[in-house]
Regions:
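Bacterial Sec-dependent N-terminal signal peptides
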Residues: 1-23
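Residues at beta-strand starts and edge strands
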Residues: 7, 191, 262-264
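Generic domain-boundary/flexible-linker signal
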Residues: 15, 188-190, 206, 279, ...
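N-terminal accessory/pre-domain segments preceding catalytic cores
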Residues: 20-125, 172, 199-204, 216, ...
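Hydrophobic/aromatic-rich core segments of domains that either
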Residues: 114-119, 124-130, 141-149, 154-245
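A short secondary-structure junction motif
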Residues: 135-139
């Protein structure tokens, strides 16, 4: 146990040292551009990126991400129609999941720009998914999510890798996209990930690397109607209209279930033995799957002892937990307000 502890301490110190060194070095990347917009977008990425990205990748890598995102917006007609908030969170951001990062944005942009340049936003999204299907097919796997270019090289990936690849491809050509995820199905032992793409002000879904003649058509349409949770992670401080299951200073988990089925607000009230509301009690919502109650969401009660989850019509197991430990500032946020 002690050995594990000290190994963890050494790893944390090494990561902290590498991160600090990389930050000092990458701080100079702002001197390599005089463009005000490039600096603004670069600052946005540095403000919200994971520390591991800061330690593992160079400033030049992130500056190229910014430049190709801007290039895509200026190249395609739909670039001018995308609101700044949507562009920053769903085009500019280079990361989709926990994949290793690579230069897929530049490669895909150069590969697809002539193929889709004269298309409408809607048709371009369909065409990008056709291109993704030409290069990648489904195969189950359990390892860490592969990078987009690695997925192309192997020509296969599980749904999480296919959707990471497809979101990256859509963003590379300036189409706002996000990976959607149901942590566990309500009807069978499994989960699934797919893609939503923003077209003219509306989010549409599609099966990653599973092209259809239209958007909002996918094999999972029927099971999604029985789902109890569909969510996505949005990097950065996001103020969209979607409900938040969880909010951290660096990212949010937003609830997308209402895009797929009829929902209801499940309100939980927590009181102590004296009948007084309990603030900051953790409320975990579990769905039975794979012989366990898998946590779909964890919320914290507000000052009135209440937590509200938007969910589907089905059965959930609810756990309540209240500890005496000091909560961190971000844990005091009430994502249900």
């Amino acid at each position: 146990m002690k050995k594990t502890f000290w190994l963890s301490v050494i790893f944390a110190l090494c990561l902290g040292t590498a991160t600090a060194q990389n930050f000092r070095k990458d701080n100079k990347i702002f001197e390599k551009t005089t463009d005000k917009q490039e600096k603004e977008y670069l600052q946005f990425l540095y403000d919200y990126m994971p520390l591991s990205d800061l330690a593992d990748y160079s400033g030049e890598f992130f500056l190229n991400q910014v430049r190709y995102a801007i290039k895509a917006r200026e190249t395609f007609s739909w670039g001018r129609t995308i609101p700044e908030e949507v562009f920053k969170h769903f085009v500019l951001v280079y990361r989709v999941n926990n994949e290793n990062l690579d230069t897929a944005r530049a490669y895909i942009f150069e590969t697809l720009k002539d193929r889709i340049k004269n298309m409408s936003m809607y048709d371009a999204a369909l065409e990008v998914n056709h291109w993704c299907h030409e290069h990648v097919n489904y195969k189950a796997s359990d390892g860490r999510t592969s990078s987009p270019l690695a997925t192309i090289r192997t020509s296969w990936g599980r749904c999480g890798e296919e959707s990471t690849f497809t979101v990256t491809a859509l963003r590379a050509v300036g189409l706002p996209a996000r990976q959607c995820y149901t942590p566990r199905w309500a009807h069978t032992d499994d989960n699934h990930a797919w893609v939503e793409v923003w077209i003219d002000g509306t989010w549409h879904h599609l099966g990653a690397c599973e092209p259809e003649p239209e958007l909002d058509i996918a094999w999972f349409d029927a099971p999604a109607k029985r789902a109890m949770m569909v969510h996505t992670t949005v990097f950065g401080k996001y103020d969209g209209k979607e409900k938040k299951n969880f909010e951290h200073p660096l990212y949010s988990k937003i609830n997308l279930l209402s895009n797929y089925t009829t929902t209801k607000n499940l309100e939980i009230s927590v009181k102590d033995t004296d009948g007084k509301p309990v603030e900051n009690a953790q409320v975990a919502f579990g769905l039975y799957n794979y012989a366990e109650y898998y946590p779909l969401a964890k919320l914290y009660t507000d000052k009135n002892g209440k937590a509200v989850l938007e969910t589907g019509f089905g059965d959930l197991m609810i756990w309540l937990r209240k500890t005496v430990r000091q909560l961190l500032p971000w844990q005091r946020l009430t994502p249900t307000r």
